[in-house]
Swiss-Prot record:
It holds the Pfam family Antimicrobial_2. This is Brevinin-2GHc. Antimicrobial peptide. Active against the Gram-positive bacteria S.aureus FDA209P (MIC=9.8 ug/ml) and B.subtilis ATCC 6633 (MIC>64 ug/ml), and the Gram-negative bacteria E.coli O111 (MIC=19.6 ug/ml) and E.coli ATCC 25922 (MIC=9.8 ug/ml). Not active against the fungus C.albicans. GO terms for biological process: defense response to bacterium; hemolysis in another organism. Keywords: Amphibian defense peptide, Antibiotic, Antimicrobial, Disulfide bond, Secreted, Signal. Residues 1-22 form the signal peptide.
Amino acid sequence: MFTMKKSLLLLFFLGMISLSLCEQERGADEDEGEVEEQIKRSIWEGIKNAGKGFLVSILDKVRCKVAGGCNP
């Protein structure tokens, strides 16, 4: 009976160790996903800001030509 308890206790601890290692690895994977998401978000923000600037400058030029007099 005593050896059976020892082996069950050993299996329990080994299972807990493997479970904690899996949780640590999963946490590392989630961190990588967050970094990738932040990179994608920053790239899209840059593209969006560049597009806004380009469109504003084009619209200013069109408005200037339609209205007539423009200040250089």
